[in-house]
Amino acid sequence: MASRVLSAYVSRLPAAFAPLPRVRMLAVARPLSTALCSAGTQTRLGPLQPALVLAQVPGRVTQLCRQYSDMPPLTLEGIQDRVLYVLKLYDKIDPEKLSVNSHFMKDLGLDSLDQVEIIMAMEDEFGFEIPDIDAEKLMCPQEIVDYIADKKDVYE
C-alpha cells in the first residue's frame, strides 16, 4: 500500500516542478498611477501599494496584484479622539479629570515614568517612534495631538 502511494507521488513530482506557462505582459503601473480595477473603474493607487502587473489571458485581461489596506486619512479631530481614548484606558488617569489641556503631572498627578508609558502607548497607537528629546516636551494631550499632526502632516 505504501509503495503504491509513494510511486503515485513520485510520478506526479515532475509535473509539480514544470515551468509555468509564459504570459505576455501588457503593462506595469507604478505606485501613485491610475489603473483599471476588475470592476472597470479607474482608481488611484496609494503609496503603500506595490506595482500592479496586467497579464494577457486569451479572451480577457486579468489583473494580478497585491493591495494593502490603507487607513482612512487622519484629521485633527480623529487624532484628538484617539489620544484621549488611549489616555482614558490608562489605569492611573481618572477619565473625569482628563481634558485636552490637562497637564500630566500637575493636573493628573502622574510621574515621569507614567509619562514615558503614555508616550509608548501613543507610539503603538499611531505606529511611529517619538524620539526621547521630543517625548520629554509632551506634557499634555493637546501637545501630543499637535506633535502627531505635525509628524503626519495633518492640517485643517
UniProtKB/Swiss-Prot annotation:
Superkingdom of origin organism: Eukaryota
N6-acetyllysine: modified positions: 88
Xref: Pfam families: PP-binding
Residues where O-(pantetheine 4'-phosphoryl)serine is found: 112
All copies of domain Carrier, residue ranges: 77-152
Entry GO CC: mitochondrion; respiratory chain complex I
Post-translational modification: Phosphopantetheinylation at Ser-112 is essential for interactions with LYR motif-containing proteins.
Keywords, alphabetical: Acetylation, Electron transport, Fatty acid biosynthesis, Fatty acid metabolism, Lipid biosynthesis, Lipid metabolism, Mitochondrion, Phosphopantetheine, Phosphoprotein, Respiratory chain, Transit peptide, Transport
Single Gene Ontology MF annotation: acyl carrier activity
Main location: mitochondrion
Transit peptide residue numbers: 1-68
InterPro entries: ACP, ACP-like_sf, PP-bd_ACP, Ppantetheine_attach_site
Localization: Mitochondrion
GO biological process, one term: [2Fe-2S] cluster assembly
NCBIfam families named in the record: acyl_carrier (TIGR00517), PRK00982.1-2 (NF002148)
Family: Belongs to the acyl carrier protein (ACP) family.
Function: Carrier of the growing fatty acid chain in fatty acid biosynthesis. Accessory and non-catalytic subunit of the mitochondrial membrane respiratory chain NADH dehydrogenase (Complex I), which functions in the transfer of electrons from NADH to the respiratory chain. Accessory protein, of the core iron-sulfur cluster (ISC) assembly complex, that regulates, in association with LYRM4, the stability and the cysteine desulfurase activity of NFS1 and participates in the [2Fe-2S] clusters assembly on the scaffolding protein ISCU.
Binding partners and assembly: Mammalian complex I is composed of 45 different subunits. Interacts with ETFRF1. Identified in a complex composed of MALSU1, MIEF1 upstream open reading frame protein and NDUFAB1; within the trimeric complex, MIEF1 upstream open reading frame protein functions as a bridging scaffold that interacts with MALSU1 on one side, and with NDUFAB1 on the other side. The complex interacts with the mitochondrial large ribosomal subunit. Interacts with alpha-1-microglobulin chain; this interaction is required for the maintenance of mitochondrial redox homeostasis.
Listed name of the protein: Acyl carrier protein, mitochondrial
Species whose genome carries this gene: Pongo pygmaeus (Bornean orangutan)
